[in-house]
Amino acid sequence: QSGLEIYPNPDLKPESGWSTEIGIKQGIKFGNWMGYLDVAAFLMQYDDMMEFTFGQWGGSNKPLGGVGFKSVNVGKTQISGIEISLSGQGKINDNVTINILAGYTYMNPISLSPNDPYAYQIQWGDTVSEYTYNNSSSDSTVLKYRYQHIAKIDAEIVYKKLSIGTSFRYNDFMRNIDY
């Protein structure tokens, strides 16, 4: 067997939480263009949020010394942010139509309990150490493996029955990973 192991977690608890969102959707028209602008703010909070975490979860007698991934509960977390989207269609003439869909999302995914131990890891020599968000993260100010800024644009030009389109997606730098 080769590669990293996926280790079970019999102590894994289900995550629970709540969310709320408020927004506005407005129709817009400029000349031959019409569409919608949608702006929303959101807030989510989780208890016992689950995260796939890298570490030495098996004993030193396991393949790769017990290094691999395991799902763990990381405690109380919060994700807040805003979403803005714009969709529209414009007629250039009787034969040509342009469709556009654009969006931007800002998220602030944080741990509300960064110093609380959420897992215990077997180290080399069978010693045990605590995992907290602060001591297991490359940047403990945001949740692991999440982007804070995401933007996307889809555009399509339709000429009679022929269409051609393009898509662009931007994800900012992923600031926090296991280390």
Residue map of PLM features:
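Flexible glycine-rich, low-complexity coil/linker segments exposed to the extracellular/periplasmic environment
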Residues: S2-L4, F54-V67, V128-S136
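Outer-membrane beta-barrel translocator/channel fold
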Residues: Q1-I6, D11-P14
